[in-house]
A protein has these predicted regions:
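Glycine-rich phosphate-binding loops that contact phosphosugars or nucleotide phosphates
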Residues: 1-126
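YjeF_N-associated NAD(P)HX repair module
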Residues: 104-170
Length: 170
């Protein structure tokens, strides 16, 4: 939602009903796994996304800051936070306010800890899944760089295989 701008994004992530629209477009199916990331874990959209996915039989994993979420009240009508509705909760250890540095003399924080922590965690999950494929004697379905010889051809095969399930590939 950040593509709409920071102020609009903040308003949208607190509105009910948006998550349902997004999740319906995703085409989730029972047995899928959904990874959600929300540093505070208190806004309506991520909580609704998790609840929607669970109703569909999807396994839901979230990355959140337990330090932040434990100090804040949910904005979801149920009063639940993201960590309350997910199957697995991974703590990104970001501090309340999400800043790594305090601006001297002003008290504001900067350097989004959740950006660094959550991206690292998500990439580790991907690497672990790829290793699981390899241990099972399978080739992980990973796109090649389009800027290396044969990359486009290899990627076309993967796109054709997965485009019905992953709309972003269409």
């Amino acid at each position: 939602m950040l593509h709409s701008g920071a102020i609009t994004s903040t308003k949208l992530e607190r509105e009910s009903g948006i998550a349902t629209e997004i999740m319906e477009q995703a085409g989730l199916q029972a047995g899928d796994t959904l990874l959600l990331s929300s540093n505070s874990g208190i806004n309506t959209v991520p909580v609704e996304a998790a609840l929607y996915a669970k109703e569909k039989g999807v396994f839901v994993v979230c990355i959140t800051s337990m330090q932040a979420t434990e100090q804040l009240k949910s904005r979801h009508k149920s009063g639940k936070r993201l960590c309350d509705v997910c199957d697995v909760v991974i703590d990104n250890h970001a501090p309340l306010g999400d800043g790594l540095l305090t601006i001297p003399g002003y008290g504001q924080v900067t350097g989004g800890a959740s950006t660094f922590g959550s991206l690292y965690i998500a990439q580790r999950i991907v690497l672990n899944i790829e290793n699981r494929y390899l241990k099972d004697g399978l080739r992980p379905p990973v796109l090649a760089s389009a800027n290396v010889p044969g990359g486009d051809e290899f990627n076309l095969q993967l796109v054709q295989t997965y485009q019905d399930r992953i709309k972003a590939l269409r």
